[in-house]
């Protein structure tokens, strides 16, 4: 039986992190978690990490698409926080962001890791950005590192 799986060390990986500025009090912690994970676990060099800032979660897919189209990166991490309010706006923003990022991964055959929090409350967002529920930015980075390596393994074996 042949099993293809990736590890998380990826010293030469070039990673773009597309970050929403909206809800920055949460998103900055996600960014710190992602960068720390890339460096400590993935051994990714500072020079191989590019941060792209956009206004909000709706803008993440367009910026991520431009990054993917450049052909200069092995993967993209999208970070943001969409917190439910009193209107259906939350559903539209969260859904379109998720759909757009998934399309980019398939269109460009490139790992795009979804580190966009979609929570009902500010407290839930804070918990997922480095307190009780861990740091979802760091988790998104781990997933990205593994997928970069899985795709490289598949390329070599297929």
UniProtKB/Swiss-Prot annotation:
5-amino-6-(D-ribitylamino)uracil binds at residues 22, 57-59, 81-83, 114. It is an enzyme of class 2 (transferase). One of its GO terms (molecular function) is 6,7-dimethyl-8-ribityllumazine synthase activity. The active site is at residue 89. GO terms for cellular component: cytosol; riboflavin synthase complex. Keywords: Riboflavin biosynthesis, Transferase. Pfam families: DMRL_synthase. InterPro entries: LS, LS/RS, LS/RS_sf. It catalyses: (2S)-2-hydroxy-3-oxobutyl phosphate + 5-amino-6-(D-ribitylamino)uracil = 6,7-dimethyl-8-(1-D-ribityl)lumazine + phosphate + 2 H2O + H(+). (2S)-2-hydroxy-3-oxobutyl phosphate binds at residues 86-87, 128. It comes from the Bacteria. GO terms for biological process: riboflavin biosynthetic process. Catalyzes the formation of 6,7-dimethyl-8-ribityllumazine by condensation of 5-amino-6-(D-ribitylamino)uracil with 3,4-dihydroxy-2-butanone 4-phosphate. This is the penultimate step in the biosynthesis of riboflavin. Forms an icosahedral capsid composed of 60 subunits, arranged as a dodecamer of pentamers. NCBIfam families: lumazine-synth, PRK00061.1-4. Belongs to the DMRL synthase family. This is 6,7-dimethyl-8-ribityllumazine synthase.
């Amino acid at each position: 039986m042949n099993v293809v799986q990736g590890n998380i060390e990826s010293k030469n990986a070039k990673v773009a992190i597309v970050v929403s500025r909206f809800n920055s009090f949460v998103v900055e912690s996600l960014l710190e978690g992602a960068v720390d994970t890339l460096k400590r676990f993935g051994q990714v060099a500072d020079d191989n990490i590019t941060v792209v800032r956009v206004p909000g979660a709706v803008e993440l897919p367009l910026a991520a698409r431009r990054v993917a189209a450049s052909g200069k990166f092995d993967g993209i991490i999208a970070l943001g926080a969409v917190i439910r309010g009193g209107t259906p706006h939350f559903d539209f923003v969260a859904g379109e962001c998720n759909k757009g990022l998934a399309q980019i991964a398939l269109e460009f055959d490139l790992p795009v890791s979804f580190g966009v929090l979609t929570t009902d409350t500010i407290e839930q967002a804070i918990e997922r950005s480095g307190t009780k529920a861990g740091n979802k930015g760091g988790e998104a980075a781990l997933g990205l590192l593994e997928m970069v390596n899985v795709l490289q393994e598949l390329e070599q074996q297929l």
